[in-house]
Curated annotation (Swiss-Prot):
Keywords from the UniProt entry: Glycosyltransferase, Transferase
Reaction catalysis annotation: AMP + phosphate = alpha-D-ribose 1,5-bisphosphate + adenine; CMP + phosphate = cytosine + alpha-D-ribose 1,5-bisphosphate; UMP + phosphate = alpha-D-ribose 1,5-bisphosphate + uracil
Native organism taxonomy: Archaea, Methanobacteriati, Methanobacteriota, Methanomada group, Methanococci
GO cellular component, one term: cytosol
Name the record gives this protein: AMP phosphorylase
Molecular functions (GO terms): 1,4-alpha-oligoglucan phosphorylase activity; AMP binding; pentosyltransferase activity
GO annotation (BP), single: pyrimidine nucleobase metabolic process
Superkingdom of source: Archaea
Broad enzyme group: transferase
Amino acid sequence: MLFLNAKFIDLDLGESAVIVNEEDLKGTSYYPQDRVLIESHAGSVIGNIYSTKTMVQKGEVGMLVSELSEISISEGEEVKLRHAEKPESIPFIKKKMDGQVLNPHEIRTIIDEIVSKKLSNIELSAFVSSTYINGMNMDEISEMTKRIAETGDMISWEKSLVVDIHSIGGVPGNKYALLSIPILAAAGITVPKTSSRAITSPAGTADVMEVLTNVELKEEEIKRIVKTTNGCLAWGGGVNLAPADDIIINVERPVSIDPQPQLLASVMAKKIATGIKYTVIDIPVGKGVKIKNEAEGAKLARKFIELGEMLNIKVECVLTYGGQPLGRAIGPALEAKEAIESLQDPKNAPKSLIEKSLSLAGILLELGGAAQIGEGQNLAWEILESGKALEKFNQIIVEQGGTPKKPEEIELGEYVEEILAPIDGYITDISNTAITNVVKEAGAPRDKKAGILLNSKIGNKVTQGDVLYTIYSGSEERLISAVNLARRVYPVKVEGMLIERISKF
């Protein structure tokens, strides 16, 4: 056991950790990455040891400010370190790595130890990787979904009809929710939309909405806002909804993987936690997104519907075209700007964005009884064209703590580079993967001002020297890096009518 004095360090390592001077570790049974229990007079917390020569002095232990909510302690107070017990779930993770089926107790233990931070990021990564490689059956996924939901707050509603739209993502510029949610809310449908931040895309719905208003809302705030406006657009992590899911997402993000068992559990756990009874799941299909073809999409849709039946949630899935970005704007600020422009003037908005937003809203207008079967999309258009959706969107922004903005008031990256067409021809391909990578290289989603604005879409004719797209960034260095990447990966491809001249064989 070690007795050391606490020193607060403003550092976030993404996991529970303690920092110890290497001199204090010499001659002991404690080594870097050992799991230890740090105890004070008022509680305890588990962390992994990181050693240092200079960050803390001999006799001190560095306590991360990001973890202090777990333990009541004063700086300089003496604490004791001792070895923590090995997590119970380690053998269960190994079992899944071997491709075996986990029982309910094993799944619940893994999720519980994720939330209690007994698992290191390395151990959690092993679990995520094992489900990515070996998958899970529907009973495992159902159990994992329920336990993820149970680890956080559960919101209940007075109304019995509470609906939601969710996209599994993967499509750059997928800002449909900023149109669909206010359309539904304007029709009197209760739609408490909670979203994650970006995992594999350059901007999640929460990242885009955060450009315009506060998205970190507590349960009481969500209830108040929804009671006033019928809807909200909030970040799920701010409400303590399914906290295990957010911890898992933070491990998935660096390697841009989203294992299907986690995808299913993540989506449906949030529906349980927010009291959703009806949901439409958008499954984009195409090159460069999570689902490559319609057969894969139909298979995933069946799993969502089956999981919904197991959880008593009515699920309807739609396969949507995901072969190129939705609309022309990619990146938080650019997407927020395009969404407002589309709400203000839908007739001149990108057709792909309008069609998708109306289609998804229309289904729930029908399920919610606001429209007859087959008439939902028409009603959605009437609400959008009349300006009622814009009015409702602005009301939601205000209730969440923001101020409605005009499109031109949204600040974009001050460092800008236009990419020009090298030849006369037609846009033959826009790579979702390349677009995503370039926008991330420019700084998104952390840099809200970073992104790409497309001037043309697939099939459009261009002339040599025309602007194909514009890259924005809040950093000159990040812009240069993004431009260099764009010149290597060609996010937008232009080809002439003459593909190849062949004179000999």
